[in-house]
């Protein structure tokens, strides 16, 4: 079982560490002065070394303020280098927890909150909190507390408080919160609305001193952050981590949604939605006429968040990430901070001290990943191969690390093009560096081979740990089959799954940190060494496979590689199937291709990557490419825009083929949901039927489309540049993007028609929907946007241009596919049909 000693939050004020955690199974908090450790060069041999092997000795200048003054005093002084971690919170965590933090998720207090306010003076503004807070639903570890400015009645499992004035409501809520401070508070968009509005409103109603009771340390800090070109006020509640579930969802689900409103996400993930109040014309009418239902609406929002966590376990995942890196929970949103501390703690275990942060500038651009121009069209029997965790393995292969990088100018003779062409100058350059036993990256930078760098060693450690945790999880799952009532096994399965997922996320985020100018170890040469070596790897195997297949199939200079990108190649093997598998059914062909990949193509790929490794004198060969999908048909329309009819994916055979679609409008959150659904359906028909079936499908969907509401057929977009493009005379300036144009028109109409209190204006960064309009219409323009639904008071519905919407959202992207297949979207009269 987990340890009874771990932290939940570590903060700092002045010289004091503010520590909250669990000790002996019980919550504890400690406030104490902290004396950090720094390091200075030493002429003596000591147990501590720098990354470049110099001996250093520890020094304790005093408290935190003394250390800061010490670093400032000697900054830039010649011959006086100071080393160590000046993020003193993390230094403290590392001292208290030198080994892995063994935590118990069930002992961490998690609160979920949602507030509602009046909107008599318009929509509530964090910067000017004039509206009263009239309901708060607060759930702490499964127990609900509901506060309302009015009478209401909920079932017994909800502890409810009714008030006749806002001051008493806020004070009672604050007292309850203060009795048992949560470790984490979550909710939907609480970082930018619920928390800052509540804090600012409490300051206005109760006073600043009272508001500080939200913090177990009686300290709240205001912070202004930039988001979508707007400044937002947020608050740090010292000792309590604010994990906005909206941020967690955006960060860790890796799927773009057309809207990030709670209502939409709940529908996508849970098949549920917020409580509807369509029977009322406005939110103000809602709470004034049916306060009981209004409270239930507030409660439902909190219940949806809790159900989302039960399904997705994003808080559990974020805590596993935080404890793995020994950072605070909120730090999981920063790749740079997380990786900085992962490296710090890893090196500390080896008594290696880290350098000070320097103000790096990303002045120089560097090359990204390689994407081949695809062979546009339809292809039979497509097989794909992909490289396993490419960027982490490139770091391992070439031993890319700050302390292994050779201090010399990069060799501009060495490039992916030069290496692949095999010309003399790159060959001579490679031989020169190989003679010194350097590992050579594809951008001409070199790295030591006599010692493994800390970055590749750390990658290797994480990769091995992930494999270990996956095996442990599978072992527990097998035991669970034999002992289904064993609750301890449930805990172990969840724990090991989280641990392996954490390692996967960390490995995948490593390059993001390395390529960030604010990273302690940022080096543009190292970042480019990774990307260009990745380019070389994928182009090397692309060329090798083409030579191999041309030789095997007696063809000459035929390109069998339909497409390739960062870490994948897509091969057309229709010629091979025609040569070997005539008159065989699909399943027999899939068996043949599966066997050919495993016994012939994969061993060839392994041999070719070993050859590349020797050519570059790599530290080790880490390029492992495995077969991904086998599809009987594939269609490419452009770079990264394709669809495959997959029979087998990584050895999993499907009873019925499944579609894999990339880059087409079916996977774009900017396409209306109904259109995404129908495009996926029609692509399935393209794979399995004929042109006449497609034409009939188009006609049927057009009829259905024309009956839908504007909200269902409009294009989802984010708006950016509202202030830039606004014009007080003409509404919008020349060259305004269409979604911004529609938003500015909407705002002007809402204002002109006196609807500003009922409908919120669109602001910078909002998700909106826009639709084309027939002219003339009340807007005197051809477009309108709206936040969620199109207000009936604007009298716009009857002017929506359904024909243009259908063409632009559905027919145009479908034509891109049908054009490469050679099919039409409507019946075409021919001489034969005319005389029939």
Language-model segments: which ranges?
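C-terminal, non-catalytic extensions of nucleic-acid polymerases
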Residues: 594, 598, 602-836
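Common nucleic-acid-contacting/processivity interface regions adjacent to the catalytic cores
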Residues: 281-403, 408-409, 485-544, 563, ...
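DnaQ-like (DEDDh/DEDDy) 3′-5′ exonuclease domain used for proofreading
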Residues: 1-181, 299-300, 304-323, 330-371, ...
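Catalytic palm subdomain of template-directed nucleic-acid polymerases
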Residues: 569-601
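Active-site-proximal helix-loop-helix substrate-binding element of RNase H-like nuclease domains
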Residues: 146-147, 156-160, 181, 195, ...
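Active-site palm subdomain of RNA-directed nucleic acid polymerases
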Residues: 274, 538-566
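Proline-aspartate-enriched helix->loop->beta-strand connector
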Residues: 173-197
